[in-house]
A protein has these predicted regions:
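A general structural signal marking secondary-structure boundaries and capping sites
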Residues: 135, 181-184
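Generic structural signal for well-ordered alpha-helical scaffold segments
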Residues: 174, 178-179, 206-207
Length: 207
């Protein structure tokens, strides 16, 4: 990376732990005025705001984001492209910019060296250019809107079945409790196995 003329990162996810591992290198690249483009995405809302904010601090890096919520298309690419004097090196595989991807995960990545006139390289760069044009600049407005959206998602709890129904034990117990109340009884003791639903039974009874 430090010996390259320019670089392009095209990854689905970026988190702060991954950016931290690259800070020293990015600082050296900035000092050497080696420019780069980084494209990431909102796919699964996994890319972290803090990571994007940190990357924006580097004057030599252009940062854009592909908004999957806008296009309704998943973005799962992982490629790293390095330009040298007479050739390119391209790494394509499974690694996002995360600490776990760089250090601990089982990841499969393939590096290939390509001449600048190589047709395969031209296809890769053209595809990246198309994605770049379809993405958004990571500016303050985007960051605030994305942060608001992500926070909203965190506040929502996913429940597969919205309506909770009584099981056999609970239904039977509720019927017997009702019989006791009809007889003006004010006390009852319920004994049931662990995990059978006593807490929910209490809630159903209160309801």
């Amino acid at each position: 990376l430090l010996e390259s003329k320019s670089f392009v990162f095209n990854v689905a996810f970026i988190n702060f732990s991954g950016v931290q591992l690259l800070l020293d290198v990015f600082s050296q690249l900035e000092n050497k005025n080696i420019k780069g483009k980084i494209l990431t995405s909102t796919y699964l809302n996994f890319t972290q705001i803090k990571a994007l904010e940190k990357l924006k601090e580097f004057s030599n890096i252009e940062l854009r984001i592909y908004d999957c919520n806008h296009t309704n298309i998943g973005f799962h690419a992982k490629s790293y492209i390095f330009e040298f004097e007479n050739f390119y090196e391209v790494i394509v595989g499974s690694s996002n910019i995360t600490a776990s991807a760089f250090k601990t995960n089982i990841e499969w990545n393939v590096k290939t060296t390509l001449k600048k006139e190589d047709e395969f390289l031209k296809n890769i760069l053209n595809e990246f250019d198309n994605l770049w044009k379809d993405s958004f600049e990571v500016n303050e407005e985007f960051l605030r809107n994305y942060e608001f959206f992500v926070n909203q998602q965190k506040e929502q709890t996913f429940i597969y079945k919205q309506k909770i129904k009584t099981n056999f034990m609970q239904k039977n117990a509720l019927e017997k409790l009702e019989i006791l109340r009809q007889k003006d009884q004010t006390k009852a003791l319920i004994i049931a196995a662990t995990g059978s639903g006593k807490t929910y039974l209490s809630a159903f009874d209160v309801k």
